[in-house]
């Protein structure tokens, strides 16, 4: 069941979202050749705790880290480790979130490690544009399929596919709330988006 959020709820989500965003941004600034994903994880956890939050991922479903650190072709949920050292030319997707006052934040971004190939730059540009197009579709009155269609059609137009096994999701008091938000779909299909959906 989709839980619509009140304006007060959304203010609570903005607080945890702001902390999650800043934790991700600063962790991303540390990305460089030679750093371990464990060091990134440690920094992110310390930052979240220092600013009154609790790492949202640590212990969630048994996950051991504060960040998911997925390198190159690893799709998602990469486990941070002292042995996973970033190399020049890698790309790393960092996914993290903070819980503040019972509200959960969750965000991810893919960072370049030093200089990356033109192919990897193109991938990052297309996925960034897919995100922007998806956000444009996330308005009351549109359908869930409009979001997925925007992502899928733009990716395919540029020669990429989408991962069907993992989806975006609602968020609130729990990390994963309804609805699931696939990166594929058809215009005008699926649930109608309403004010208060997050």
For every predicted segment, state its role.
Residues 1-198:
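Active-site neighborhoods and metal-handling regions in enzymes and metal-associated proteins
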């Amino acid at each position: 069941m989709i839980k619509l959020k009140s304006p007060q709820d959304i203010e609570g989500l903005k607080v945890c979202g702001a902390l999650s965003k800043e934790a991700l941004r600063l962790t991303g600034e540390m990305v460089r050749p030679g750093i371990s994903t464990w060091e990134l994880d440690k920094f992110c956890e310390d930052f979240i705790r220092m600013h009154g939050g609790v790492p949202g991922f640590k212990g969630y479903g048994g996950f051991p880290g504060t960040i998911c650190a997925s390198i190159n072709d690893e799709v998602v949920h990469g486990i941070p480790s002292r042995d996973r050292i970033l190399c020049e030319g890698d790309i790393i997707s960092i996914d993290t979130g903070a819980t503040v006052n019972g509200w959960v934040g969750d965000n991810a971004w893919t960072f370049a490690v030093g200089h990356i190939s033109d192919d990897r730059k193109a991938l990052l540009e297309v996925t960034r544009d897919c995100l922007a197009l998806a956000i444009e579709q996330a308005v009351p009155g549109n359908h869930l399929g409009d979001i997925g269609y925007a992502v899928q059609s733009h990716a395919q137009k540029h020669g990429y596919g989408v991962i069907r096994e993992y989806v975006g999701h609602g968020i609130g008091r729990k990390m994963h709330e309804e609805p699931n938000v696939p990166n594929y779909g058809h215009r005008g299909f699926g649930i109608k988006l309403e004010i208060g959906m997050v």
